[in-house]
Design a protein with these regions (language model features):
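Structured loop/turn residues at beta-strand edges in well-structured enzyme cores
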Residues: 2, 43, 111
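N-terminal beta1-alpha1 ligand-phosphate binding loop
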Residues: 2-27
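Structural motif
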Residues: 7, 49-51
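Structured loop/turn residues at secondary-structure junctions
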Residues: 10, 54-55
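FMN-binding flavodoxin-like domain, especially the glycine-rich phosphate-binding loop
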Residues: 25-32, 47-48, 55-170
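Short acidic low-complexity segments
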Residues: 33-43
Length: 170
């Protein structure tokens, strides 16, 4: 059976949760799920999928470093990229063609993923440290999002996640 690797770069865990949901949909391949910081060898994998989240408008540096260090391997395999960000909760920003973070990311890197998707993330105010809680609350206020810091808000469309996994033939 072919092997696939789902790699996540996450701050609060939603990207990992999305990877695990995708892995649970696998019918045609054996799937490993791994943090980007723990990936050591890509040789055994026919398919490599990278998911990364946005925090304060940026992907983590480890994502760019990983892509630069593994560009030739990524290009030689079936591959995909997905972004997780709360901006994607808005219909006019929930596809790779209209999501500003995906557009900037693709312009900034040399890798051209064969499949690209974007998923809305999660705001988990009770879990955040004081500074993050109020910085994110301010961002949500500006963008007309939820600001009740006693609540968590999950925007991820799990049907869309499962459809992406199916489209990748996992």
């Amino acid at each position: 059976m072919e092997k696939s690797l789902l790699i996540y770069s996450t701050v609060d865990g939603q990207t990992e949760a999305i990877c695990r949901r995708m892995a649970s949909c696998a019918k045609n391949t054996s799937v490993d799920v791994m943090s980007i910081s723990n990936v050591r060898n890509l040789d055994d994998y026919k398919t490599i999928i990278i998911g990364a989240s946005i925090r304060y408008g940026k992907y983590r540096n480890e994502l760019y470093n990983f892509i630069n260090e593994n560009l030739l391997v990524l290009e030689s395999r079936k591959n995909a990229f997905f972004s997780v960000n709360v901006v994607a909760r808005k219909p006019e920003k929930n596809s790779p063609n209209n999501n500003p973070y995906v557009i900037k990311f693709l312009d900034k890197i040399n890798w051209k993923p064969k499949n690209i998707e974007v998923f809305a993330g999660k705001i988990d105010y009770p879990k955040y440290k004081f500074i993050d809680k109020y910085a994110i609350k301010f961002i949500m206020w500006v963008t007309k999002g939820p600001t009740d810091t006693s609540q968590s808000y999950e925007f991820t469309d799990w049907n869309k996640v499962e459809a992406f996994a199916e489209n990748l033939n996992l």
